[in-house]
Design a protein with these regions (language model features):
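Solvent-exposed serine/threonine-rich low-complexity stretches and specific carbohydrate-binding patches
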Residues: 29-38
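Surface-exposed loops/turns
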Residues: 1-3, 13, 38-39, 52, ...
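Short, glycine-anchored, charge-dense loop/turn motifs used at functional sites
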Residues: 22-29, 61
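Short beta-strand/loop motifs in extracellular/secreted proteins, especially
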Residues: 15-18
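Signal that preferentially marks extracellular ectodomain short beta-strand elements
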Residues: 43-56, 69
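C-terminal tail/sorting-segment detector
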Residues: 2-7, 35, 58-86
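Aromatic/hydrophobic beta-strand junction motif of beta-rich domains
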Residues: 5-13, 46
Length: 86
């Protein structure tokens, strides 16, 4: 990746948001957050590195974004594939 991967989304309420990156076999390689974010247009950036700061190899990974509302009850999940190409 020459640039950070940027995930863009809209929150209808204030929420605690976490981004996780997994291998296709389900191994967690990176977790960002949780971090509090206000309602509205939001972005999270990921630099292509694992938890130890190493650049991930080219390939396909899975991302998951979880947003938990201030009440601790409401939860929204987004997930999908992510390709790393350098």
């Amino acid at each position: 990746m020459r640039q950070d991967a940027v995930f863009t989304y809209v929150l209808s309420h204030d929420a605690s948001v976490e981004l996780a990156i997994y291998t296709l076999s389900g191994r967690l390689v990176c977790r960002l957050g949780p971090q509090g974010q206000p309602a509205g247009f939001q972005q999270l950036s990921w630099d292509g590195r694992d938890q130890s700061g190493r650049l991930l190899a080219n390939g396909t990974y899975l991302y998951r974004i979880v947003a938990v509302g201030g009440d601790g009850e409401s939860e929204v999940r987004f997930r999908g594939p992510l390709s790393v190409l350098r």
